[in-house]
């Protein structure tokens, strides 16, 4: 599904943990809609556009946030990121590489990438985060709960 900027202090997945047959909160998983970003696990973009933007910024975001950064750079060029319910897939977050919060070098890399993301997008985060996310919903949890 889509990615919400500001969720958890940086960015997080909408509807994380919802069953595959769920229509989501307010039927959002069953409706095509714009998001500031979508997960790189199921990201489709023209190769020419990908190349024109320089692809994923692996120098600053080797593992985490590279997809979100790319989508935000797309938005800055006037494009939109659309989540469609008409393509289905299951995203097993970090299944192959393990969690970023497991400690050690992996967690240090994640924290550094998170800090770079927060610094690069500080103005957007300071303005309340995602323009596609209702400001009456919390940014603390991935559950569309009210503030």
Annotate each language-model stretch with its function.
Residues 29-54, 59-88:
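A short, conserved alpha-helix in the catalytic core of glycosyltransferases
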Residues 1-10, 60:
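Conserved donor NDP-sugar-binding/catalytic core segment of glycosyltransferases
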Residues 7-35, 39, 44, 81, ...:
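C-terminal, non-catalytic tails of nucleotide-sugar-dependent glycosyltransferases
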Residues 92-95:
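Conserved active-site-proximal loop/helix segments of enzymes involved in bacterial cell-wall
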